[in-house]
Curated annotation (Swiss-Prot):
<dbReference type="InterPro" id="IPR003791">
    <property type="entry name" value="UPF0178"/>
</dbReference>
<protein>
    <recommendedName>
        <fullName>UPF0178 protein YPO3033/y1450/YP_2656</fullName>
    </recommendedName>
</protein>
<comment type="similarity">
    <text>Belongs to the UPF0178 family.</text>
</comment>
<dbReference type="Pfam" id="PF02639">
    <property type="entry name" value="DUF188"/>
</dbReference>
Length: 152
């Protein structure tokens, strides 16, 4: 098991949480992005740079993810594909997607796309706050504990 990060849009503060967790637990963290990334030196952190283009990083993650791997992404369609392959999807705010919640989120995303296409201003998500970071860290710790238990 390992952690995959949709790194182009992942907040730096969340990457830092992941870097600390990788070194603390020995869990491999792979950041996938279409641009070069700076990471701390660690044998548990690696980067994969893909070509620029729509969904290229997402497709790379979907190809590589395995059952029970954790994927960090705010991209709803990517999260849906990860779940379909048996992976776990967690967004940077600490929301762990399930088969039920991902369907609901896909429907809401499609609805919002339709509204934006008709000219309605929908706004974006709120700024990541301390509570979000704590929720993310808590969910990450839960997954890491499950991974340790399965490895025994």
């Amino acid at each position: 098991m390992q952690i995959w990060v949709d790194a182009d849009a992942c907040p730096n503060v969340i990457k830092e949480v992941l870097f600390r967790a990788a070194d603390r637990t020995g869990m491999m963290v792979t950041l996938v992005a279409n641009q070069p990334l700076k990471t701390p030196p660690s044998k548990f952190i690696r980067t994969v740079q893909v070509a620029s283009g729509f969904d290229v990083a997402d497709n790379e993650i979907v190809q590589r993810v395995e059952k029970n791997d954790l994927v960090i992404t705010a991209d709803i369609p990517l999260a849906a594909e990860v779940i379909e392959k048996g992976g776990i999807a967690l967004n940077p705010r600490g929301e762990r997607y399930t088969p039920d919640t991902i369907r609901e989120r896909l429907n809401m995303r499609d609805f919002m796309d339709t509204m934006r296409a008709s000219g309605i201003q929908t706004g974006g998500p709120n700024t990541l706050n301390q509570r979000d970071r704590q929720q993310f860290a808590n969910e990450l710790d839960k997954w890491l504990q499950q991974a340790r238990n399965q490895a025994k």
